A protein has these predicted regions:
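Leucine-biased recognition of intrinsically disordered, low-complexity hydrophobic segments
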Residues: 26-31
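N-terminal active-site segment of His-dependent metallophosphoesterases
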Residues: 33-107, 180, 186-187
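His/Asp/Glu-rich metal-coordinating catalytic cores
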Residues: 87, 97-257, 262
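Acidic, His/Gly-rich catalytic cores of divalent-metal-dependent hydrolytic chemistry
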Residues: 254-280
């Protein structure tokens, strides 16, 4: 597949989909390796990304885990810390809604501040970027290690030290939108895309009763990204036709894992699932 940069080919070895074309569950701790041939010279080190979504931080009274509405966030942060992640990606619905009170937002902010790594957040359909969204009221955009698409950055977050760009379209209201519209021109060695919405396989794409926030194989392929971090589904799943490594992480509560994505010095993209670490 031709990249925006030029001489790029990705070789993938996908096993056949087992979900009627809708994708395939990631095997527990399974390994997927995607090889790029974009550069002849290796990077000095690997880049380690942790991808999660649909944490649904909520008021304590509505929460499991002993009544801690930030428990899923705490577990994901602990896991990212344990695997020494360079960057944590939260692909939508980090918060249950935009009506959460100050106490739970303050606690979530403290947990994010205590992280020893950058966090990139994509607002989803539960927590869209509104004038009084949780991101604005909670002051999350002021946290030095937190980048929020649609708040601190309009569309893309650069990481020059890694020659990496992470881009995505935030939900800005409660209406329908195209999560993968307008793919960005590649300007860095590594490019990761984020989207929060519903993957629809080719055989059902024409269904007029399909959900909102839809994208399919063509939109995925058009990103030409090295990895597409997806949110909105509670189950971890690989989707698409293989042109781009596109994965739902699933929610921490149901999946009990995060996706571990390693952008290797040799140019490979290695995707596995990592069990949630003991909360700390």
């Amino acid at each position: 597949m031709a990249d925006h940069v030029g001489n790029f080919r990705r070789r993938t070895a996908f096993s056949p989909c087992s979900q009627g074309g809708a994708g395939q569950d990631l095997a527990p701790l399974g390994l997927r390796v995607y090889r790029t041939e974009r550069y002849s010279s290796p990077m000095p080190t690997d880049i380690v990304l942790v991808h999660s979504s649909d944490l649904h931080v909520d008021e304590d009274r509505a929460a499991a885990h002993g009544g801690d509405g930030t428990a899923a966030l705490r577990s994901v942060l602990a896991t990212a810390r344990a695997v020494r992640a360079d960057i944590l990606l939260l692909a939508g619905d980090t918060f249950e809604n935009n009506q959460l009170g100050g106490a739970i937002l303050d606690r979530a902010g403290r947990r994010l501040t205590d992280a020893s790594f950058p966090v990139v957040i994509l607002p989803g359909n539960h927590d869209p970027v509104l004038a009084q969204s949780v991101f604005v009221r909670g002051g999350f955009g002021k946290l030095p290690n937190v980048s929020i698409l649609g708040v601190t950055h309009n569309e893309a977050v650069p990481f020059p030290a890694f020659d990496l760009e992470i881009w995505g379209h935030a939900h800005r209201d409660y209406f329908n939108m195209a999560p993968l519209r307008g793919p960005r021109q590649r300007s860095t060695r590594w490019q990761v895309a984020m989207a929060h919405g519903h993957y629809e396989p080719p055989e059902t794409r024409a269904n007029p009763l399909r959900p909102s926030w839809v994208f399919g194989d063509e939109e995925i392929a058009a990103t030409a990204a090295d990895y597409l971090a997806l949110g909105h589904w509670d189950r971890p799943m690989r989707v698409g036709n293989g042109a781009v490594p596109a994965y739902y992480s699933g929610s921490p509560d149901l999946a009990e894992t995060v996706n571990l994505v390693r952008l290797t010095a040799a140019g490979d993209v290695v995707v596995t699932r990592e069990p949630l670490s003991a909360e700390s």
